[in-house]
């Protein structure tokens, strides 16, 4: 599962293809080539989806941080 409700909501707002790649890569721990094979797309497609997803999440979560207390 995702570490925080704020992050979870941001991930759920991603486009379907990006959200799927993020969940499979970061939550399920799959490798890019495994995701590509499972989804029947080139590995570069998965890399691109993850890159776009990270950019969107970075912009949406700007200023958000983990409370270290």
Predicted regions: what they are:
Residues 1-12:
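Acidic, proline/glycine-rich intrinsically disordered inter-domain spacer in sigma factors
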Residues 11-19:
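Short helix-coil-helix linker/hinge
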Residues 16, 27, 52:
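Short, conserved catalytic or interaction motifs in soluble domains
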Residues 21-25:
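A short pre-motif secondary-structure segment
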Residues 28-29, 34:
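Flexible coil/turn residues that form the inter-helical turn or adjacent wing/linker of helix-turn-helix
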Residues 33, 39-63:
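DNA-recognition helix of helix-turn-helix
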Residues 67-69:
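Intrinsically disordered, low-complexity basic tails/linkers immediately adjacent to helix-turn-helix/homeobox/MYB/SANT
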């Amino acid at each position: 599962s995702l570490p925080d409700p704020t992050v979870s909501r941001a991930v759920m707002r991603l486009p379907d293809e990006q959200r799927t790649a993020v969940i499979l890569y970061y939550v399920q721990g799959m490798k890019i080539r495994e995701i590509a094979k499972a989804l029947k797309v080139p590995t570069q497609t998965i890399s691109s989806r993850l890159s776009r997803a990270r950019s969107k999440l970075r912009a949406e979560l700007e200023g958000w941080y983990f409370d270290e207390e």
